[in-house]
Amino acid sequence: MKRVENLEVIDWLLETFMLSGTITNNYLLKDEYTRHIAIGNLFIDFDDRNAFIYLRRNGFYRVYYLINQEDRTFSFNALQPLVLEILYRGEKNFPQNAKSFWELSGFQSHLSRDSYFLKNTAANEILDLRASQVIKAHSHEHISFTKRLIDEYLDLYTGDNLSLEQIESFVSKGLVYLALVDGQMAGILQADHKNGIFWLGHLVVDATFRGEGVAQKLLKYYLNEGAIAKCNQFQLWVIKDNEAAVGLYKKHGFNNLNKSTFSMLKM
């Protein structure tokens, strides 16, 4: 594993290994490469056919791959866990060959997620939710609570755990919603606007308040905010076997986008 010192290294890697028929999950953009290189968090490794980009996160590396030969193994020698996600559309297109490649290299299956969407139509009427006990997070206490819930309840490797700086940025834009129960902070929902889509990034309820309809209140508030903003579509990712969450989203009109990922982990 070699640290990337400049963008020219990435340009060479992509030019050399991104070929017709290359299997890849590499969706990093140029500005992301530049940002991660500047703080020393980007690394690469390769052989004569396959290449790997490692993005260092808090306690693990996220792996982006360019595979041109699947019937071989690779010796991964990272000192921290490695995690990757493989995107596919529909169970009939499940990438078994890619899964086998990673299993031969010592990776194990971790989590599977599905994407759900909801069109923003006239049916999503704007409601008066002032009595819903959901507010927009705005204080240091709210930020700390959001950070604690995300760190405590979401999967470390695939939960997209946000830094304090990222949470502060979302709060400053009015995109973190806080549910209260009898004045106590009970749950959060973090949203984001991207290209006309209003994404649900994180929805977490403190264990003390589960079963009290907190998630539903947060979801309704989020849908209302999207209707006010006239977004084109709502979208989210949910763990495939999280029946309670899937049921909640379906109840509010979300449909499966036929787009899934499964993650693999090497400790």
Give the residues covered by each predicted segment.
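A conserved beta-strand-loop-helix scaffold within acyl/acetyltransferase catalytic domains
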Residues: 55-59, 160-182, 186-204
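Acyl-donor-binding surface of acyltransferase catalytic domains
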Residues: 67-130, 263-265
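Conserved donor-binding loop and adjoining core beta-sheet/short helix segment
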Residues: 26-79, 189-201
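Conserved active-site alpha-helix within GNAT-family acetyltransferase domains
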Residues: 92-111, 216, 240-258
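Conserved hydrophobic beta-strand within the GNAT/NAT acetyltransferase core sheet
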Residues: 86-89, 200, 234-238
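Conserved acetyl-CoA-binding loop-helix of GNAT-fold acetyltransferases
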Residues: 69-82, 205, 211-224, 228, ...
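A short beta-loop-alpha structural element at the N-terminal edge
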Residues: 1-15, 131-146
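Conserved GNAT-fold acetyl-CoA-binding loop/helix
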Residues: 12-35, 150-171
